[in-house]
């Protein structure tokens, strides 16, 4: 693919780097949330470009639920070590003590306690006043209307009716003590942009994004990859090897795989060109209307 056909990627890159530098200059204690997925990998790559040849002026934070894919944990530790990043890992101790898990307590309670509450705990613990996230507007309708600088009150809540105007590339980062800003440098990127940029820049990603034979079972209309032995099979369920990959990554019991033969980045890009479904179709946490993304954000979710 010729360089001249990818000029829009360079424009997106420049915008994201500008946002990252603005936050680093404006806030006293920023952090970059690192969820280990493709968007996090692109955001980290952009941050490293923004401050090259220096090191990142802020740490990475992973809010761990204890249920990520094993390959994600391996990739997280390897990446942080390779790039010399300060990596903070937080797991909600109350949730761990209660034994919260997606099979017993369901996706809504698991997400609220281990992700939303865990994130708020970590932000309070370290006193971060700005947190980068890899969310994009094309992912989901509540994210589509959220600003690049997303204001949060002292309880980390988002009010969609209380958003600040963003004229051109001017962002309002004024906050009072206890308040914070969630920052989304990839807001204007699409899933296709992400994959083209990963290919263009040769960015390392978790192998789960590439198709391979993996052990899966069908449950609730989802192809669940069995990553460890913390699952009880229901009557009639059979684990089979199938060619699958993931378009989005999260906790393995709550993230559905898609059947695919795309084993290279060009094949993924080609597959995305004809896809008619959302990348979040496999996320169980998005299926419950009562637990919609906007409601989660109002409660403090990213």
From Swiss-Prot:
SUPFAM superfamilies for the chain: Adenine nucleotide alpha hydrolases-like (SSF52402)
Pathway recorded for this protein: Sulfur metabolism; hydrogen sulfide biosynthesis; sulfite from sulfate: step 1/3
Entry keywords, A to Z: ATP-binding, Nucleotide-binding, Nucleotidyltransferase, Transferase
GO molecular-function term, one example from the UniProt record: ATP binding
Group of enzyme by EC: transferase
Enzyme Commission designation: 2.7.7.4
Pfam families: PAPS_reduct
CDD domains in alphabetical order: Sulfate_adenylyltransferase_2
Classification via Gene3D superfamilies: HUPs (3.40.50.620)
Keyword field contains ATP-binding: yes
Reaction it catalyzes: sulfate + ATP + H(+) = adenosine 5'-phosphosulfate + diphosphate
GO terms for biological process, alphabetical: hydrogen sulfide biosynthetic process; sulfate assimilation
Domain of life from the UniProt record: Bacteria
InterPro entries: PAPS_reduct_dom (IPR002500), Rossmann-like_a/b/a_fold (IPR014729), SO4_adenylTrfase_ssu (IPR011784), Sulfate_adenylyltrnsfr_sub2 (IPR050128)
Protein role: With CysN forms the ATP sulfurylase (ATPS) that catalyzes the adenylation of sulfate producing adenosine 5'-phosphosulfate (APS) and diphosphate, the first enzymatic step in sulfur assimilation pathway. APS synthesis involves the formation of a high-energy phosphoric-sulfuric acid anhydride bond driven by GTP hydrolysis by CysN coupled to ATP hydrolysis by CysD.
UniProt family annotation: Belongs to the PAPS reductase family. CysD subfamily.
Name listed for the protein in its UniProt record: Sulfate adenylyltransferase subunit 2
Lineage: Bacteria, Pseudomonadati, Pseudomonadota, Gammaproteobacteria, Enterobacterales
């Amino acid at each position: 693919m010729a360089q001249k056909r990818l000029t829009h990627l360079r424009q997106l890159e420049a915008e994201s780097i500008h946002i990252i530098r603005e936050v680093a200059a404006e806030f006293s204690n920023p952090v970059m949330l690192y969820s280990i997925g493709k968007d996090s990998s692109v955001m980290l790559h952009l941050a490293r470009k923004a401050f090259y040849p220096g090191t990142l002026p802020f740490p990475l934070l992973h809010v761990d639920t204890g249920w990520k894919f094993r390959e994600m944990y391996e990739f997280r530790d390897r990446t942080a070590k390779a790039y010399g990043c300060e990596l903070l890992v937080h797991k909600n101790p109350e949730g761990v003590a209660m034994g919260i898990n997606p099979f017993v307590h369901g996706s809504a309670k698991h997400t609220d306690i281990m992700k939303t509450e865990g994130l708020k705990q970590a932000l309070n613990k370290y006193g971060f006043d700005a947190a980068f996230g890899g969310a994009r507007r094309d992912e989901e309708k509540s994210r589509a209307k959220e600003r690049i600088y997303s204001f949060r009150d002292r309880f980390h809540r988002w009010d969609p009716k209380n958003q600040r105007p963003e004229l051109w590339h001017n962002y309002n980062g004024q906050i009072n003590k206890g308040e914070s800003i969630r920052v989304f440098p990839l807001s204007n990127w699409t899933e296709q942009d992400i994959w083209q940029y990963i290919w263009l820049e040769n960015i390392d990603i978790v192998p789960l994004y590439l198709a391979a034979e993996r052990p899966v079972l069908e449950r609730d209309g989802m192809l669940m990859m069995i990553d460890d032995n913390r699952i009880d099979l229901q009557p009639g369920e059979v684990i089979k090897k199938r060619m699958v990959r993931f378009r989005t990554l999260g906790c393995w019991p709550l993230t559905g795989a898609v059947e695919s033969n795309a084993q290279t980045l060009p094949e993924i890009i080609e597959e995305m060109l004809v896809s008619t479904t959302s990348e979040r179709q496999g996320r169980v946490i998005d299926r419950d209307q009562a637990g919609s993304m906007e409601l989660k954000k109002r409660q403090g979710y990213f």
